[in-house]
Amino acid sequence: PIHMFDMMRFLFGEVESLHAIGSTHEYKEVDDFSVLLKFANGMHATLATAADASWLFPFERVEVFCHHATLLTREMESLTCSSNVEGHFTVQTMHQLPREERWGYVQEDRAFIDSIVNNSPPLVTAFDGLMAVRIADAVYESVRSNKPVVIKQ
């Protein structure tokens, strides 16, 4: 889930606080989580993850709902977009792209190389990694305390 926290920050901004519940099923450590995140801009999001889920696809999906619009990804295989209340939608499939491109590795490498060649700030910094770890730590803290946790910036 740490990569999902990173992606949520990229898409929606800084996480202000969160409240999580967790349970232990297959492993000694807490392995299932449900997290409600509140962002500094007033948005909120949920994340559910299970370490003991089956191997049925999609392993990961993102659903975004706003202003009578919906975006839905399915395991980086497709993107479904609906932008009105009538229910019309479009589906873009990416399954024909090589995995490295479909999952963003090519674009990530290109952005990193461009930042070196052009002496420009990288798109991803150590601060981004730090914040993802702080959010993950806050999830465990919230599970232990059963209270919301404010994320230190």
Q: Model features per residue range: what roles?
A:
Residues V30-D31, N84-E86, A136-D137:
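Short secondary-structure transition/capping segments
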Residues S34-V35, L71-T73, T90, A138-S142:
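Alpha-helix boundary/capping detector
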